């Protein structure tokens, strides 16, 4: 599909429009698989083209990598071709398959489609797309507010002085991962032993990712249950991860994933996540007198001010983030309800 569209555009400057039926006539083996999988592949390509011409920063559509191919496909629910019943899933052309279902489906949910993929560890996962009628959530009376300051060591420190105490799953598994990778390096590339060991390495990475995701879900749920407004900094994580000393910690913490979880959880309950400007001097500003300490160095973990304020650097920043978030959102809280 992509090769023909690319060739047509280079020769004529026009976009080639063809249907999956053309490819089935040319390649009869395509009839052996789910017909909707081919339709969705074409739709995804069309979306990629539209995104590129709308905004070139998306990049021109590319072929899948032979080295690291994405083994997945998407299909749609039509006339009951996808069914979920008694721990089994029915897929077009695949029949009934036993699955491990991780959550219950709402009774009013309508099944729209499914995406099946094989991860690097050799396990298959399916994501089911459901349509649900969501009732509009009324904006709650905001009574509790908190500021979160990103911390390399802790994940975050809040304006009440709580340190998250992130377990650092990747660093804790580094020795085990290094041992598995050394064993992989001793295998002949492409051999059965190499492929088997490759899956073992991938499973360690998958386990770490699942541990991190589970922790971030639980931590974001705790914050959502207790606070009505959460204030954070709009950090440039891409630049931070490129730093020599910060890269591993930034990737291990999963701050971006954590803030995404926070945002959708808060919105579902009519609460609010406020992002303040990344250039706001939260760390350099004294939370007591408001004076800015321009010569504050990264190595200084305790904030000392001439007014007598002495406190943890991240706690001081979190208090300032909370206050700035309330200011830009135009929300006024009673003094007893502020996180200070």
Please give the residue ranges for each predicted region.
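Nucleic-acid substrate recognition interfaces
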Residues: 1-340
